Amino acid sequence: MNDLDYAGDINPEKAWDLLKNNKDSHLIDCRTSAEWNFVGVPDLTNLGKNTHFVEWQSYPLMEKNDNFLKEISELGLSKDSTLIFICRSGARSRSAAEFLTNHGYKHCFNFCEGFEGSHDELGHRGSVNGWKNSKLPWKQG
């Protein structure tokens, strides 16, 4: 294991490999609905899977979603499933992975680069790392 309170951080290549080769792996996008609508979302259709969407925090106040555990439970996923959490940059997804691990989910990973990745030298996201920059499938609108 590791010294983390969840299964660990994974990069785009490892996440895609898990989603592709582990039939009981799931991607949970825990960004806000505004981000899903305006920035785009991971597209797993060529794997025969769907991304699950459950907000960790709600826009615009960014308050923690008190129904997060309930909404995850309603997805019907086993606590033994491999769950990969993704947010914009890896912070909220880490919190979500830790939270669910503490609630009995055994294989919660943080997509540590996030959907948009780190800031570049100009303070913009999307050009350094992350889901989009790694050329993994995504869609907008």
Predicted regions and their residues:
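Rhodanese-like catalytic fold shared by cysteine-dependent sulfurtransferases
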Residues: M1-H26, S33-T82, S93-G141
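Conserved G/P- and acidic residue-centered "switch" motifs that form tight phosphate/ATP-binding loops
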Residues: G90
